[in-house]
Amino acid sequence: MNNIWWQTKGQGNVHLVLLHGWGLNAEVWRCIDEELSSHFTLHLVDLPGFGRSRGFGAMSLADMAEVVLRQAPDKAIWLGWSLGGLVASQIALTHPERVQAIVTVASSPCFSARDEWPGIKPDVLAGFQQQLSDDFQRTVERFLALQTMGTETARQDARALKKTVLALPMPKVDVLNGGLEILKTVDLRQPLQNVSMPFLRLYGYLDGLVPRKVVPMLDKLWPHSESYIFAKAAHAPFISHPDEFCHLLVALKQRV
């Protein structure tokens, strides 16, 4: 069985695992890893099939979560950005004893728009899947541009994301397609009503992929969770607002 790429740094008494989003890899955290590793034992992970975690094909969300768990510390705060938020949520649902707290960043329990539920239109996700087969580098770049649109530092932030993608070999098309399939089909809104560990949800006010309208809806559905909106961020608040982002995580550490 293949192992995934996993790097541990820092000596904090609380473990923090960072899970990246679709099409990316753990290099995306380099803007905050020094700061966080001074407070936590930090675990940087390339999800199966992404970055340096080669030798994996497309996977279901449940299988992806199991592969990640194999190398994880016994207990940690799990932070997932975007698609990574679904992986962290899945782990909280199936292995709650391994999760000290869960943090989702610019993530939704249901990325796809449904009846009376704001999200990405399913035909947009299907379009991305179609375009992947035609020109996947350009498709990934378009997806990255969407993530930073509207922020004061949009161009700079998009460059940072693109650099992360290009730093390592591109994931295979079937892996990228599998990730989009998870975004298109998974719905964890009801199951996550039952988690009892501390649950922090972070959002960007300008996010074009996870509409801010979901925030009050989830506040109501999950009264045990807390939400925070970065007023001038889009889909990658840790890149546009690194200090504020780290401050929230250090504050969470005091509470777990």
UniProtKB/Swiss-Prot annotation:
Q: Which residues form the AB hydrolase-1 domain?
A: 15-242
Binding positions for substrate?
22, 82-83, 143-147, 235
Q: State the SUPFAM superfamilies in the record.
A: alpha/beta-Hydrolases (SSF53474)
Predominant location of this chain?
cytoplasm
Question: Which residues does the Swiss-Prot or TrEMBL record annotate as the active site?
Answer: 82, 207, 235
GO MF entry, a single one: pimelyl-[acyl-carrier protein] methyl ester esterase activity
Stored HAMAP family:
Carboxylester
The text of the family note is: Belongs to the AB hydrolase superfamily. Carboxylesterase BioH family.
- What is the protein name for this chain? Pimeloyl-[acyl-carrier protein] methyl ester esterase
